[in-house]
């Protein structure tokens, strides 16, 4: 469980792909102890299990299902990934509870800048619209945001 407040990121160092899965290696400035092997990490909103730790490099296994539903299908070496360690008892919750169970990807359809506010519109398949509520929470690339408006197959955050 995460809260969607992202303070850290990692860069994609290596991607190994097979027919049904991939392994990704991220370089990060976060410190991971060997005891955190097997722990969950919010990576761009997807709950992934740490499979290897080597100093500042961490590895993850991505199943065919994960690749089909997340933006990891588009990831390339050098890309930056939002990362957040899982919540611990007593942690402050500033965003909303983020489980990291991703249903689909949306695409940016428009960005409007009004004074100091950005309104970002996303195009979403109609089948997933039923899961959205105006003023409800959504995690986009792991970041906790509030849905400001829903219309047809588009939703907005700002």
Q: Where would I find each of the regions flagged by the language model?
A:
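Conserved loop->alpha-helix
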Residues: 1-158
């Amino acid at each position: 469980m995460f809260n969607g407040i992202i303070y850290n990121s990692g860069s994609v160092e290596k991607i190994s792909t097979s027919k049904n899965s991939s392994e990704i290696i991220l370089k990060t400035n976060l410190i991971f102890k060997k005891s955190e092997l097997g722990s969950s990490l919010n990576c761009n909103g997807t709950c992934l299990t740490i499979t290897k730790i080597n100093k500042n490099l961490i590895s993850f296994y991505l199943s065919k299902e994960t690749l089909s539903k997340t933006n990891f299908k588009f990831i390339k070496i050098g890309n930056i990934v939002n990362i957040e360690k899982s919540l611990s008892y007593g942690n402050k919750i500033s965003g909303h509870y983020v489980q990291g169970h991703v249903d689909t990807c949306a695409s940016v359809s428009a960005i409007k800048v009004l004074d100091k506010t950005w309104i970002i519109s996303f195009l979403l398949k109609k089948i997933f619209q039923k899961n959205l509520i105006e003023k409800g929470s959504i995690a986009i690339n792991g970041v906790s945001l509030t849905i400001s408006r829903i219309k047809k197959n588009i939703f907005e955050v700002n």
